[in-house]
Design a protein with these regions (language model features):
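Exposed, low-structure sequence patches enriched in small/polar residues
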Residues: 1-371
Length: 371
């Protein structure tokens, strides 16, 4: 496979003090790719092996007319991957490993500032292309039985990333400047999870549970200082449904999670744990073959929400199916919840997303069957 592309970046910026750096960009670059894909497979007696080793010749040319700088780069990229799976009766086991290397876009080493929004500016502080190495491995074991309606899987994986550049943010009052610096950085991540379910013929019942633990280490550049940090996340969820009567079905599910990030050996950025949880109960009543009544109530909790940490939601609906017409009446947001806030971690940053909701309302839908 062959691919070629041509690019250009030409910008100018007024009204922002760029200091000794240029406020203009006039950058032109081309990329050329030639890829040879290779895949080998072996299957015998429940064992399946796969080995891939694609080769890519990646060439780039760069012409920065502001700095009068012309360069060319040639890279031979090898991205091997391996997977194995073995099945025996209702059991299965699998493993995988992969390695990849990517080279950054020449457009990422422009010298002048670019305004990304009215408070954010971006500039590259590097003289070479970014190079990122990624390695990963994972294992898993599973059990599936359609006869007993039992399903279980336990898995774990590891990921390693190395980059010759580190990215960060420099704050100047109400504005921020995204910067990339020629300094190598590494990150590691580990994950262990499980997921299982069991069905029961009696009362048409089902239970399911899942859990996940992840831990990662990385580095962050903030105001020209590199902060090593680590993050951890624990999440657990469960679900169950039962039909005790032919006309009654109950569904209950819920879960909780804990997310923490902390810098290593520094108190400049104190640790805060984001804790969240949710519970939901849904009731389906099949009054007749034509009439179905549904009611649900849900609670969402977050410990960092300033107000209303418990956000309650509720809905009621009635569906009536006639010969040529379907009628549905929905009562939405019966607790009149006007605002809902989500809080989450990403690296060392805590993000808050607030949604303004419609007040309590009723909707009547009519659907006609033409045939």
């Amino acid at each position: 496979m062959a691919n070629a592309s041509l690019h250009g970046i030409k910008t100018d910026l007024d009204g922002f003090d760029t200091g000794v750096y240029s406020s203009r960009n006039d950058l032109w670059y081309n990329t050329y790719e030639l890829t040879l894909g290779q895949q080998y497979k072996f299957e015998k007696n429940g064992l399946r092996l796969s080995l891939g080793c694609p080769l890519e010749l990646y060439s780039q040319t760069l012409d920065d007319r502001i700095r009068d700088d012309k360069d060319s780069y040639v890279h031979l990229l090898v991205t091997p991957n391996f997977s194995a799976k073995y099945e025996w009766l209702d059991w299965s086991a699998d493993a995988n490993a992969n390695y990849s290397k990517t080279v950054g876009d020449p457009g990422g080493i422009y010298n002048g500032f670019i305004m990304t929004n009215y408070r954010s500016f971006q500039r590259s502080y590097v003289e070479q292309l970014s190079e990122t190495d990624r390695m990963g491995a994972g294992v898993g074991i599973g059990y599936r039985s359609a006869i007993t309606a039992t399903f279980l899987r336990i898995s774990g994986n590891y990921r390693y990333t190395r980059d010759n550049q580190i990215y960060g943010t420099r704050y100047e009052g109400a504005t921020s400047v995204v910067q990339a610096v020629d300094q190598s950085t590494e990150s590691n991540s580990y994950r262990l999870g499980f997921d299982g379910s069991k069905g029961f013929d009696w009362l048409q019942a089902m239970v399911r549970a899942s859990g996940d633990y992840s831990y990662s280490t990385s580095e962050r550049l903030i105001d020209d200082t590199v902060y090593p940090f680590h993050s951890s996340t624990v999440s657990i969820s469960a679900e169950g449904s039962i039909t005790p009567l032919p006309w009654l079905n109950l569904v209950l599910n819920g879960g909780c999670s804990w997310n923490t990030s902390r810098t290593d050996g520094s108190s400049d950025y104190p640790t805060r744990t984001v804790r969240s949880a949710y519970e939901k109960l849904k009731i389906n009543i099949y009054a007749t073959k034509q009439l179905t009544l549904t009611a649900s109530v849900e609670d969402n909790y977050n410990n960092l929400t300033v107000k209303n940490r418990h956000a309650w939601f509720g809905d009621i609906s009635a569906k009536l199916k006639l010969e040529h017409v379907d009628l549905e009446l929905r009562l939405n947001n019966i607790f009149d919840q006007r605002q809902y806030t989500r809080v989450s971690y990403s690296g060392l940053d805590i993000y808050t997303q607030t949604s303004q909701l419609r007040p309590r309302n009723a909707v009547l839908s009519v659907r006609f069957k033409l045939l």
